[in-house]
Amino acid sequence: MASDPTSGSTPHLPPDSLAWLTWGLLASLYFVGYFQRVAPAVMVDELMRDFSIAATLLGNLSAIYFYTYAAMQIPSGLLADAVGPRRVATAAAGVAAAGIVLFAQADSLWTAALGRGLIGASVAVAFVACMKLAGHWFPANRFATVTGVSLLIGNLGGVLAGVPLSEAVASVGWRTAMLASAGLTLVLAAVVWLWVRDDPSERGYASHAHPEALNNAAMSPRRSLKMVLSERDTWLLFFAGGLIAAPVLTFAGLWGVPYLVQVHGLERSHAAVFTTTMLLGFAVGGPLLGALSDRMGRRKLPYLGASLAHALGWVIFLLVDDLSATALTLLFAAIGFSAGGLIIGFAFAREVNHPGAAGTVGGVVNMAVLGFAAIQQSAMGWILDRNWQGDMIEGARIYDAAAYHAAFLWLAFSAVGAVLAVALTRETYCRLRFDSDD
């Protein structure tokens, strides 16, 4: 018979199995969000034909998800701090399902854009809620590791939106595939509401949260946001996260597949394998680099090393022609893996801010991750259209290697910017500055 966690004078901390299950169910919403984020990459031709659009408008349609996602990051963090991740995530999953249905049944570009916007705005809470929940269910010295696993789970959604979704689109059409994902999202909303709890104390266990984090009601949203935005390192980590993530989300999330199809002559499903490799590297890099940072007791050094490797990867991609399939696969995996270092930035940002503002700081940093990706996706489309030579196949524009090269230059510039931002941060040695200042 299992022992009562409340027996004795002091409740026990929650068992790892319960912590991972509770947190993992909520993290499933991040899986859904990531799937929806990169899904347009394998339906580029269908979307261009159905809505009669070129690259600029397609980039904008895909990027609307990122714009609304980014816009909701700070509100999501404030809500997670104020009312808890369970309520926020359940409501978000329901709204996401509605947005997916609207997108799948759209008969105009504007309706499709509204659907994509609803999806982005609703799943925006997922990552922030995961970080908020992790601070209550796991010890502080595992925060970067758990946050890294969030990235792994999310990227598995991206993997599902690669070859499997490509095959589903070819088999039943993009609209039916999207409707099926809406149904699964509704099921997830019910499961999160029934099982997830914001703090172990709701199940009779002791909490891992800092005492200040348990008194969120005493801190107004305005004060929380002011404290976070007044911290210098918050801004450096804001730019670092956005600039390192945007190239991967832009390439693997939208323009990588059409580039490989149009320039290298690959089949769409084969091209999706290459971009999926980048997402898999991203997925694996998050938890491994997060765990390395936790083990080293350092944040700046491993984050800087990952940022340098990421920038080098994009420079090689742009400068080295005629890479073999094997070399390109390894390069994409390395680019994705090194980008996973952005996970360290979330733990880093949490440590330089007040523990009662954990949700808010997560929202601020994550706003850059998605906001910068939105800007880059739209900018890539604009650059491609500016360099279009007039070729079309079955109603879809075809862009040559020079056009893509002009667009992809900005991926390398972005990665170099991330290196500079991380280099200017101050090390925390995996300790909360709030405690250090007491």
Predicted features, each with a name:
Residues G8-P15, D199-F238, D438:
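Juxtamembrane intracellular "pre-TM" segments in multi-pass secondary transporters
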Residues P40-V42, E231-G286, A373-G381:
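Extracytoplasmic gate region of multi-pass secondary transporters
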Residues S52, G84, Q105-T111, P139, ...:
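Helix-breaking motifs and short loop linkers at transmembrane-helix boundaries and internal kinks
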Residues A71-W110:
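Conserved MFS/SLC helix-loop-helix module at the cytosolic interface between two early adjacent transmembrane helices
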Residues A82-A93, D294-L308:
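Cytoplasmic membrane-interface "Motif A"-like loop-to-helix N-cap segments
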Residues G94-D107, L308-D322:
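C-terminal ends and interior cores of transmembrane alpha-helices
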Residues G115-I153:
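Cytoplasmic helix-loop-helix junction between adjacent transmembrane helices
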Residues S150-S201:
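Helix-loop-helix hairpin linking two adjacent transmembrane segments in secondary transporters
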